[in-house]
Amino acid sequence: MSTNTVPSSPPNQTPPAASGIATSHDHTKFNNPIRLPISISLTINDTPNNNSNNNSVSNGLGILPSRTATSLVVANNGSANGNVGATAAAAATVETNTAPAVNTTKSIRHFIYPPNQVNQTEFSLDIHLPPNTSLPERIDQSTLKRRMDKHGLFSIRLTPFIDTSSTSVANQGLFFDPIIRTAGAGSQIIIGRYTERVREAISKIPDQYHPVVFKSKVISRTHGCFKVDDQGNWFLKDVKSSSGTFLNHQRLSSASTTSKDYLLHDGDIIQLGMDFRGGTEEIYRCVKMKIELNKSWKLKANAFNKEALSRIKNLQKLTTGLEQEDCSICLNKIKPCQAIFISPCAHSWHFHCVRRLVIMNYPQFMCPNCRTNCDLETTLESESESEFENEDEDEPDIEMDIDMEINNNLGVRLVD
């Protein structure tokens, strides 16, 4: 297993000052700063070598070519294809004067390119679309910029797809935390199985550039890959997996067969592998996930979101006498468009932070701030609720006070 950080000039030369790689993609929090482009192989074993500087050459892994180097691209059928660019996303890409090509798609590499590559037309993806399928029309620059993040990279988000039609929890697939990956045009993100060798490799690079790996034995070590072109179009490919890749419940190819590149859309459902032994153990469950592309999952705060959050803060201030701006569990700020849980005692937290406390003794809940016990299943028509409302009849109208304070802050005068 090796991780190669690719220089912007041939290895035997000192990189020029203007390398064409954005300095914002340097990650100094690592002992060895990571710069794009980067490349990882998940399948080829490293070969011991006395000269550690030549390991990437002697073990047959190779490195990604520099922008000016002549490159050899191994196509899906194992033959050299000189008509495609240096960032071919369906094969191992190596320098012709550095390392031999590995003629198998199972040695497919994970590589991430930076944004704004020079001579973009020379770095076109090696895309093989299914019959009767064509690429979408090219988009204008304003639309293209909206698809990018602030660094000029495209993004993809994977979240677990909970199959509500399944009667068994075991058949709902493997649960995982949301995964977000970012990549420049021409990049390829490997999908595979999590192993110790993978762990060692990805520990050297930032999370957003990791391969997409899962702890499930029904997924091949190199199961498939995502590709992204210069228009922000994302593609899915099965790379000879044994248990299959499914897009919207349709298998892409038969076992141990490389599939075509299928264009992805927001909301598509992907399944990796099939349950083994009934999926009774998590390690034998398939992975079902929904995809969201190019920041489409991000919510923009509007006036309603901001006003709702302001009401929550004012409610806490009026009921507890304290102004709470941060989540007391994670100590981060509570912001608009975030999922928030508000307890009957008016304390609030990020739902992600308090979820375990909510489900631990549900429906009983003890506030971690004031230690108040409450019943989350109490109905609005219960006697205790009615008594609570009657006791508060003589109390000032908290809601009116909140409205007054919000409008005063906004410079608006209430008129009866």
Swiss-Prot record:
UBC4-dependent autoubiquitination occurs at Lys-150, Lys-204, Lys-217, Lys-237, Lys-240, Lys-260, Lys-300, Lys-306, Lys-313 and Lys-317. UBC4-dependent autoubiquitination is responsible for DMA2 turnover. UBC13/MMS2-dependent autoubiquitination occurs at Lys-237 and Lys-306. Lys-204 and Lys-306 are also ubiquitinated in trans by DMA2 E3 ligase in association with UBC4. The keyword Cell cycle applies. It is found in: Cytoplasm. One of its GO terms (cellular component) is cell division site. PROSITE patterns: FHA_DOMAIN, ZF_RING_2. Its EC number is 2.3.2.27. One of its GO terms (biological process) is protein ubiquitination. Residues 1-30 are annotated as: Disordered. Residues 189-252 form the FHA domain. It is an enzyme of class 2 (transferase). It catalyses: S-ubiquitinyl-[E2 ubiquitin-conjugating enzyme]-L-cysteine + [acceptor protein]-L-lysine = [E2 ubiquitin-conjugating enzyme]-L-cysteine + N(6)-ubiquitinyl-[acceptor protein]-L-lysine. Its main location: cytoplasm. Keywords: Cell cycle, Cell division, Cytoplasm, Isopeptide bond, Metal-binding, Mitosis, Transferase, Ubl conjugation, Ubl conjugation pathway, Zinc, Zinc-finger. GO terms for molecular function: ubiquitin protein ligase activity; ubiquitin-protein transferase activity; zinc ion binding. There is a cross-link at residues 150, 204, 217, 237, 240, 260, 300, 306, 313, 317 (Glycyl lysine isopeptide (Lys-Gly) (interchain with G-Cter in ubiquitin)). E3 ubiquitin-protein ligase which functions in cell cycle retarding in conjunction with the UBC4 and UBC13/MMS2 complex, 2 E2 ubiquitin conjugating enzymes. Involved in nutritional control of the cell cycle. Targets the G1 cyclin PCL1 for destruction. Required for proper spindle positioning, likely regulating septin ring deposition at the bud neck. Present with 2790 molecules/cell in log phase SD medium. Interacts with CDC123. Interacts with PCL1. Belongs to the DMA1 family. This is E3 ubiquitin-protein ligase DMA1. It comes from Saccharomyces cerevisiae (strain ATCC 204508 / S288c).
